[in-house]
Amino acid sequence: MIQISALPAFTDNYIWLLQDPHTQRCAVVDPGDAAPVLDWLEQNPGWALSDILVTHHHHDHVGGVEQLKGATNAKVYGPANEKIPARDVALNDNDRITVLGWDFDIYTVPGHTLGHITFYHSGVLLCGDTLFAAGCGRLFEGTPEQMYTSLERLAALPADTRVYCTHEYTQSNLKFAQAVEPDNADIAERVESVRQLRARGEITLPSNLALERLTNPFLRTSETSVKQKADERNGRDNRSGAEVFASLRAWKDKF
């Protein structure tokens, strides 16, 4: 069974570490900095880094790739439509790869960037900066319609899917979620749970899709209360889920 843990990087990034205890091979996701990974390998002799998975081209996700590739000769997987350093395998929508014995389906999810991809294995979603705990990534390259479609695709995965995003943004995202839905009891409960985790210095990830559907405003655009709030914010009737999403995202950008 593959074990997944987080290697903290920078101020709020997580590099996900996937370990196969039977072979002592491991993989990392979005290593924006090589140092945390090299430190872990040094502290865990006998383990070999065999694979590097990259979701998109931003520096805080690829900054350590070349150094790690040089040190370990790991195979680098990344989106075909973005410039990824040292990439060995270019991935397109609906490709399938096998890493550490696990099959991963590749979904292209434009929005945060145009070529952004996610890696999905039954029960596990490695989603970079597309879906966050209680939030979603900023639209640096894509349109609101693209991001809405990408998030709807991810939200349709099984409810028990664990969500491994790459930033510790949960508390600030929940503040926005409460502004959108002040009467949502699930959000209030999650705020308290996350507050306790952070007070103990613990991470708030992974999340899961069932929880996201209850507490993430960007996955709740069809809820009447969310639509009403979005309509209030931009003073018009947002007729589609994509329009509600666009209103929420513009609000969150200034929140």
UniProtKB/Swiss-Prot annotation:
Q: In which pathway does it act?
A: Secondary metabolite metabolism; methylglyoxal degradation; (R)-lactate from methylglyoxal: step 2/2
Q: Does the keyword Transmembrane apply?
A: no
Among SMART domains, the record links this protein to: Lactamase_B
Q: Kindly list the cofactors needed.
A: Zn(2+)
The UniProt record lists the EC number as 3.1.2.6
Q: How is the cofactor bound?
A: Binds 2 Zn(2+) ions per subunit.
Q: Which Gene3D superfamilies match?
A: Ribonuclease Z/Hydroxyacylglutathione hydrolase-like (3.60.15.10)
Q: Name one GO biological process term.
A: methylglyoxal catabolic process to D-lactate via S-lactoyl-glutathione
Give binding positions for Zn(2+) 1: H56, H58, H112, D129
Q: Which UniProt keywords apply?
A: Hydrolase, Metal-binding, Zinc
The superkingdom of the source organism is Bacteria
At which positions is Zn(2+) 2 bound? D60, H61, D129, H167
- InterPro entries reported for this sequence: Clx_II_MBL, Glyoxalase_II_hydrolase, HAGH_C, Hydroxyacylglutathione_Hdrlase, Metallo-B-lactamas, RibonucZ/Hydroxyglut_hydro
Which molecular-function annotation in GO is an example for this chain?
metal ion binding
**SUPFAM superfamilies attached to this UniProt entry:** Metallo-hydrolase/oxidoreductase
Give me the reactions it catalyses: an S-(2-hydroxyacyl)glutathione + H2O = a 2-hydroxy carboxylate + glutathione + H(+)
The family database entries (PANTHER family) matched by this protein are listed as: HYDROXYACYLGLUTATHIONE HYDROLASE, HYDROXYACYLGLUTATHIONE HYDROLASE GLOB
Give the family per the record.
Belongs to the metallo-beta-lactamase superfamily. Glyoxalase II family.
Oligomeric and partner information: Monomer.
Function description:
Thiolesterase that catalyzes the hydrolysis of S-D-lactoyl-glutathione to form glutathione and D-lactic acid.
Q: Quote the protein name from its UniProt record.
A: Hydroxyacylglutathione hydrolase
Origin organism is: Pseudomonas fluorescens (strain SBW25)
